[in-house]
Amino acid sequence: MDFGLQPPEITSGEMYLGPGAGPMLAAAVAWDGLAAELQSMAASYASIVEGMASESWLGPSSAGMAAAAAPYVTWMSGTSAQAKAAADQARAAVVAYETAFAAVVPPPQIAANRSQLISLVATNIFGQNTAAIAATEAEYGEMWAQDTMAMFGYASSSATASRLTPFTAPPQTTNPSGLAGQAAATGQATALASGTNAVTTALSSAAAQFPFDIIPTLLQGLATLSTQYTQLMGQLINAIFGPTGATTYQNVFVTAANVTKFSTWANDAMSAPNLGMTEFKVFWQPPPAPEIPKSSLGAGLGLRSGLSAGLAHAASAGLGQANLVGDLSVPPSWASATPAVRLVANTLPATSLAAAPATQIPANLLGQMALGSMTGGALGAAAPAIYTGSGARARANGGTPSAEPVKLEAVIAQLQKQPDAVRHWNVDKADLDGLLDRLSKQPGIHAVHVSNGDKPKVALPDTQLGSH
């Protein structure tokens, strides 16, 4: 628009008669509010999507949801920034308008100039107002130029302020083919409903054609057949067993059927004795068992009565049979040359150990747990044989036992007759096993003297005797 062709009265009049900067200020406030709302929605939307995708909802569906929602969050953030820019441009337009409004000549001033010109022209009879008229016209020209410059500046500023970035539509966050799929599913459901209705109609038609009135007739016929069968069987039994055969058969059958009902009154009759037996098992406490003498616990061990309280002789001799100690065969005639000589062999102490102290029988003797705890008890059991040797001495028990044990004094007497046949060895207890291993590979009769520390100490013949 060429503002130079428009007189200042019109230009200034339009600026003063227009709505002013109020609408632009309202637009700026509205754009600011829209920008803030979009920014808040974008932040809230992003927070909700992130919380669901990282905490409460995991998996491929969650990832797909987050991927679909991310473009919408980006769009809201971008649109919020554009709205903020529009608000700033609206405020810039307000500034441009106020600048142009202040720059244009006020309409009353232009009207006064025009009134003065008319008055000067009317009174210029002799040309005396020519200079005043020229000055008034010059002033008017300046007003024209001033309005023209103000409007050109305003047009340029308002054009820049009103140049906005075009807004874009929100992205599509759903599957475009979803509506088509929904329509197809709806069509299938409708077709299925139609098929179901058709099947229901067909079944109803078939049911209407079925002759349900024959069912009572069939039931009545079955009842008549059952009655006739019962009468026929009664007549047959009476014909075979006499006039009262059917009645007797019925009584026997009823009695047999009622046998199973006897358990009810039998249980009622036995409830009182059962109650007494239960109380007896719970509260009856038998007297404690008498203490078993320890001397009788050694019976059956095959030991002499004089050795029942101590260590029994582990070595014994057999008649007509050599004893085995490891790999050595010991002749039946052996003896101890002197009391200081100790014949070392595998020590097999078998002691009559003291019996376990008699325990009190539990109060509830008839309880299953009490009976189970007595299983495997040691009361009256024979003491187990204790094998203290190792190496060659532990193999002394592997020989064939003697057919009949003999007294140890007889064996010692036989050994005393051949004292030179015995080879004597002195050894400490620590080297005893090694010596016995070496002697097991040498033939002959060996007597090993075991010493305790610096002072040799030979055991008596009746404590631990053996051959090697």
From Swiss-Prot:
SUPFAM superfamilies: PE/PPE dimer-like. The lineage of its organism: Bacteria, Bacillati, Actinomycetota, Actinomycetes, Mycobacteriales. Disruption phenotype: Cell envelope-associated glycolipid phthiocerol dimycocerosate (PDIM)-positive mutants with simultaneous deletion of PPE31/PPE32/PPE33 genes have a growth defect in Mg(2+) restricted media, particularly at mildly acidic pH, but the PDIM-negative mutants grow normally. It comes from the Bacteria. Residues 447-468 are annotated as: Disordered. Belongs to the mycobacterial PPE family. GO terms for biological process: intracellular magnesium ion homeostasis; magnesium ion transmembrane transport; response to host immune response. InterPro entries: PPE_C (IPR022171), PPE_dom (IPR000030), PPE_sf (IPR038332). Pfam families: PPE, PPE-SVP. This is Uncharacterized PPE family protein PPE33.
